[in-house]
Amino acid sequence: MAAQIPIVAATSTPAVARNSKKRPASPSHNSSGGGYGASKKKKLSASGFAQGVSIEAMNESKMASSELSSGPVEKAAKPLPFKDPNFVHSGHGGAVAGKKNRTWKNLKQILAAERALPWQLNDPNYFSIDAPPSFKPAKKYSDISGLLANYTDPQSKLRFSTVEEFSYIRRLPSDVVTGYLALRKATSIVP
């Protein structure tokens, strides 16, 4: 039985070399006897060797790169003009210190916090601020339909958007016209 293990190992390695398309870690790769468990042990020892070789190669490359970079040290010593040399990071706050990142408050929380503040009657708010008039021209709406009105009747000063509204406005009595103008707060004395 012990004599068969080296034979199995010898037959499994050429299969790896012959069929290079299969991954070496796949269970279908070890088709020879010995089962999955036996080949797993062999792979662990082989991968351990490969890792040892790669670590040694990495250490050698680091040493070689450090020998090459020892020449121009003057460029690294020059301080950057936009960095403060006396800056010391406080170390508290943020995710680095183990604190949670800030979360946004929703509208209810903001309003509740504002209500809890000691407001005076003279304090400015959005309703007490007098804003200057806008530079954009105000939109004009029809007095009859409420649609955007591009036209104004020169006789009654009512706004309209279509031809049908214009004919309707021309048939209105003067008291109804003054009522429409009063709704728009544009009362003008019409003779």
From Swiss-Prot:
Keyword NAD: no
Function: Proposed core component of the chromatin remodeling INO80 complex which is involved in transcriptional regulation, DNA replication and probably DNA repair.
Highest taxon of the lineage: Eukaryota
Entry's Gene Ontology BP terms: chromatin remodeling; DNA recombination; DNA repair; positive regulation of DNA repair; positive regulation of DNA-templated transcription; positive regulation of telomere maintenance in response to DNA damage; regulation of cell cycle; regulation of chromosome organization
Gene: Ino80c
Subcellular location: Nucleus
Region spans: Disordered: 1-41
Transmembrane domains' residue ranges: none
Protein name: INO80 complex subunit C
Organism of derivation: Mus musculus
Cellular compartments per GO CC: cytosol; fibrillar center; Ino80 complex; MLL1 complex
